């Protein structure tokens, strides 16, 4: 949770709101305080209460920016409804508010209109008051970075003037990591750690930096520094679990994944159930694996996506037929912008000898996710051939038939 939500100030605001809900209080809360309460409920997995708080705020303060932004983002990310998000955004009275600009850009980005979003934000730059322009530049760079649009993020950040600012260096480190410059990112992070060795954020980002380079033991060490500062730091627990998983220490990885689940909530709590199940399956503990697969599906708000993650695990553990059934049933049900699992599905078809289906899914995989396609299928084609060329080439003949392992459930 954000440090603000742990503060006494916020706890006091939350208490006042809860008393209002019980009709025991008569305190005044402004629209931004109510929006913060909605955000808190959202982060703690209480979606119904989150919507109720934001809706109450809009009823009391019609057209207020903060609660309408919250409801619009809920429509966008939870309901997957950009039209509803746009309608809520249009209710905002102050359409010169920076948060309104950011919201409209996010709606565009969620519809894969990245260049349109950049153009929109650029066009509004000259409308920003001179003393707010640098903040605007930084916010836009951060926004693009959050969406993984690192080239656009770097373009905006290059216009930021205070290159010695802590916030600038933090964002620069993230962008460098995203663009594959992990050594440079590490240099910036070490500089930040020297300035504040008690920041769990910096240690966690250093752990991620080592992780992407495959330096798993170094990643574990960085995570342990963060955990020494805060034994319940969510990112540190997750980073250490992931690194332990990557070096094959399944039992310890499960221990840290479960510790992570105890201190987090909502979707973030649930997604590691698949990973725990995967470890148990790899250890041939099928009943335990089934238990965690079931948990993951039951607690998922997007069951098709969870089934696809389950299929990837099954495939990796040799249950090719079971994985194939899940891929074929669920990839046709996901949203248009979903891009994970198609190359895995194609590989399943190949291993099962379903070459007509392989060729059909291969074309979809290439359109959806070139990186995944190369990772999963490159060994079937001549070295240095590009994924876009795969449909024109003949894959290497299978050396043997996929095993017929199936799960007893």
List each model region and its residues:
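Start-of-helix register in tetratricopeptide repeats
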Residues: 32, 66-67, 99, 133-135, ...
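Structural marker of alpha-solenoid helical repeat scaffolds
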Residues: 60, 91-95, 127-129, 162-163, ...
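Register position in tetratricopeptide repeats
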Residues: 43, 77-78, 110, 143-146, ...
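TPR-repeat structural position
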Residues: 10, 47, 81-82, 114, ...
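Canonical positions in the second alpha-helix
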Residues: 57, 89-92, 124, 159-160, ...
């Amino acid at each position: 949770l954000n440090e603000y939500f742990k503060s006494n100030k916020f706890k006091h605001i939350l208490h006042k709101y809860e008393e209002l809900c019980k009709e025991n209080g008569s305190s005044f809360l402004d629209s931004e305080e109510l929006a913060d309460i909605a955000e808190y409920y959202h982060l703690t997995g209480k979606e119904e209460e989150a919507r109720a708080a934001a809706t109450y705020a809009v009823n009391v303060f019609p057209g207020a920016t903060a609660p309408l932004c919250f409801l619009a983002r809920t429509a966008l990310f939870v309901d997957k409804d950009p039209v509803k998000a746009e309608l809520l955004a249009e209710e905002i009275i102050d359409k010169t508010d920076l948060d309104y600009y950011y919201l409209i850009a996010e709606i565009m980005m969620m519809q894969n209109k990245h260049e349109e979003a950049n153009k929109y934000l650029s066009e509004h730059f000259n409308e920003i008051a001179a003393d707010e322009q640098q903040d605007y530049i930084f916010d836009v760079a951060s926004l693009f970075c959050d969406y993984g649009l690192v080239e656009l993020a770097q373009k905006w950040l290059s216009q930021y003037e205070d290159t010695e600012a802590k916030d600038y260096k933090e964002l620069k480190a993230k962008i460098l990591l995203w663009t594959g410059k992990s050594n440079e990112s590490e240099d910036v992070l070490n500089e930040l750690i020297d300035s504040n060795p008690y920041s769990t954020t910096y240690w966690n980002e250093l752990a991620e930096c080592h992780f992407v380079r495959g330096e798993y033991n170094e990643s574990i060490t960085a995570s342990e520094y963060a955990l020494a500062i805060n034994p319940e730091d969510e990112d540190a627990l997750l980073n250490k679990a992931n690194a332990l998983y990557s070096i094959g220490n399944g039992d310890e990885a499960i221990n840290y994944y479960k510790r992570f689940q105890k201190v987090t909530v909502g979707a973030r709590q649930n997604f590691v159930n698949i990973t725990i199940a995967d470890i148990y399956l790899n250890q041939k503990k099928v009943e335990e694996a089934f238990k965690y697969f079931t948990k993951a599906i039951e607690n998922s708000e997007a069951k098709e996506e969870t089934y696809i993650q389950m299929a990837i695990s099954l495939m990796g553990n040799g249950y090719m037929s079971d994985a194939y059934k899940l891929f074929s049933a669920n990839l046709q049900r996901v949203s248009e912008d979903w891009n994970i699992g198609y190359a895995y599905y194609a590989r399943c078809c190949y291993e099962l000898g379903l070459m007509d289906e392989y060729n059909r899914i291969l074309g979809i995989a290439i359109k959806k996710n070139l990186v995944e396609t190369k990772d999963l299928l490159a060994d079937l084609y001549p070295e240095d051939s590009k994924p876009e060329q795969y449909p024109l080439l003949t894959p290497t003949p299978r050396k043997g038939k996929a095993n017929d392992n199936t799960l007893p459930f």
